[in-house]
Amino acid sequence: SGTLALSKVLKGNATDSEKEFTFRVKLENAQFDKATQRDAYDVVIREANKADVQTTVARDANGEYVLTLKGGQTATLLDVLYGTTATVAEDDYTAEGYEAVSTQTAAVNSQTPDAAAAFTNERNVGVLSVTKNAVGNAVKFEKNGRAVFSFSATLTYADWIDLTQTNNLPTVDGKTPKNMTVDAKNHTV
């Protein structure tokens, strides 16, 4: 038998080192049937500069083993039968601003008894500044002697492009959103 190691890596300028990410592991092996598939696996969770944590992960009603990891942690399932293929799915965290950079599957066999799958998420936060310059004598003042205009901004962060050669665009770590629109109306300055 061998092992299956799942590791979690976080990149970007706005990650939360205490955030837990959920993984669903489905193990398949020609030798498995409902009677022989294991109900639980021993797991070792490793993290730099901390003592290893030993725990157990049980198979749920869907036949999956559910684990949670923080950035920088690795969970290793022990005593995984040769010939086992692991399909690992990470829950979706895009609503929280985390982009899945990599996903993997892994197989434990006699050639790779210690299989590994690494999962990386990236989260970056930037600053959007809007400047309204009123020129001339026809500026309309509406609130307490202040000019009023509105704006809405739509930033699409799913598809980043490298614009290090382009000036005057908002960037995070030298990159800017591929799709960006700004519409200015009714904002008080």
Predicted regions: what is each one?
Residues 1-189:
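Solvent-exposed loop/turn and edge beta-strand elements of beta-rich ligand-binding domains
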